[in-house]
Amino acid sequence: MQRNREGAATELGYVFTFLLGVLLLTMFSLWIYDIETATRERWNIEAIDANMNDLSAAIERTDIASRIDNSSYAERVYWRATEADESQFTLELTDTLLILHDAQGELDTERSLSGTASSPHTGIVDLAGVEAIWVVYHNGVISLELDRPMF
């Protein structure tokens, strides 16, 4: 009886080739997952920046409208959806700042406002499930609201 060592070597080659393939596929999967996660985080930041820019521009336009005597003004700003947990977001309006508070602390941001209007700015809005935010000037106050004003 003669032993065939070539057959055993071939089988070992198949096993090592398979294991090398599994290793390469695992590394590729982890690499793709990292790319996808980084892209999603970048898109979140860009969407939040665009939302904050749109809101601050609407507030500045409302400041201008507040200078007209006996006027009321409302502007709807659409909130772009993000992958972040928006139920953790709170938007606050002060006389000189628009502030986004993230309860997790990762996406906190703020925008400076000119504060040129003589009207006080107020409003705190929870962003859970929000599609649009209203910037309203009525009765001498500029505010953020979720519901369309009825004036």
Set out the residue ranges of the language-model regions.
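C-terminal juxtamembrane segment of a hydrophobic transmembrane alpha-helix
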Residues: 10, 14-39
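N-terminal export/assembly leader peptides and their processing motifs that target proteins to secretory
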Residues: 29-151
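N-terminal leader/signal peptides at the extreme start of proteins
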Residues: 1-6
